[in-house]
Amino acid sequence: MRKGLLVILLLCSIAGMSWNWWPLPMAEPDTTDRDSLIYLAGLSATAGSGRFSASMISENEQGATAITPFSGSLRAAIIKPATRPRRWYDYDGAIDITGMIHSPLDEAIYGNGQGRFPVYRGKQGSVIIRQCYAHVRLYIIDFSAGVMPVSDHMDTPLGTGSLLLSHNAPSMPTLHIGIDRWTPIPGLFGYLEIKGGLTHAWLTDNIAVHNSMLHYKYAGAQLGGRLPVNISYEFHHAAQWGGYDAAGNDLGNDLHSFKNVFLAHSGGHSYNESFNAQGNHLGSQQLALTLQGKGWHIKGYWQNLLEDNFNFIGRGQNLSDGRWGIS
């Protein structure tokens, strides 16, 4: 009897922390009275003695830095950040372009960039669009379109991306729809939150396979809300698919092929895809535990990588594999 009474009191106290049945940021007053623009311009140069520039120079730059030892670049950008999280709508966007000159690759060793480095293919100068996109949030739904990095929204602030998608990869023409930030489920007082999204992008490197595409989707749930301890789980799925091979053969670019890729079903024209899965598929999961208080939080997480078959986190993988992190 006493245990039952304690459980009831605990549930009442948790609910009493917030009687708002759907505690969205938009429920609070919007105290921001203006938007802002950021103007950016920069000039940089590198010089080195090896065949490549230092790897740290290229980290988190979306492929907009030269890998050769001598280079110079000019960057100009106009950025409109999202500044109104409590308004029922918000928007942001950017135009960010880098012009670059660089020393040639060692053709005897690297084949004039035909393989690993297509941006350097017979050139000593490039213009790279880092970002040219627009994003709109309508209440809880996010829409994005344009040239931008494909982000997997995983929490890796000290690295170059998650195990699945890298911040070193060039930006791509992209369409995206989703719920990009943790959003409470109506009626649960904010103690269960979800997020997820669907992205379609066009790859631009055109090595061996031309005009191929990227399919990416993710979903996550977080339990805890305003409690001192939160636990969250996310699943991310990416697949390269479609395009045309060197002989011009169609590798599957229609809606039926997209359905196979979306569901990771077999199909396509190649022998392997006819009994395996159409497209090249990779998945990743993240399990995270967050401790939080007023003005601070600390998160410990584990990410793993999946290929071909899905296994729930902890099944089919060694716990020591993957990435362990704290943020």
Predicted ranges, named:
Residues 21, 26-39, 80-93, 137-141, ...:
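Short loop/turn motifs that connect adjacent beta-strands in outer-membrane beta-barrel proteins
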Residues 178-327:
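Signature for the C-terminal beta-barrel architecture of outer-membrane proteins
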Residues 88-136, 151-168:
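Surface-exposed loop and membrane-interface regions of Gram-negative outer-membrane beta-barrel proteins
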Residues 4-13:
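Sec-dependent N-terminal signal peptides
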Residues 39-54, 91-101, 136, 143-149, ...:
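Transmembrane beta-barrel strands of outer-membrane/channel proteins
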Residues 65-71, 122-129, 168-172, 210-214, ...:
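Transmembrane beta-barrel outer-membrane domains
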Residues 21-74, 83-97, 194-200:
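Transmembrane beta-strand segments of Gram-negative outer membrane beta-barrel proteins
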Residues 59-64, 100, 115-120, 159-165, ...:
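Extracellular loop and loop/strand-boundary signature of outer-membrane beta-barrel proteins
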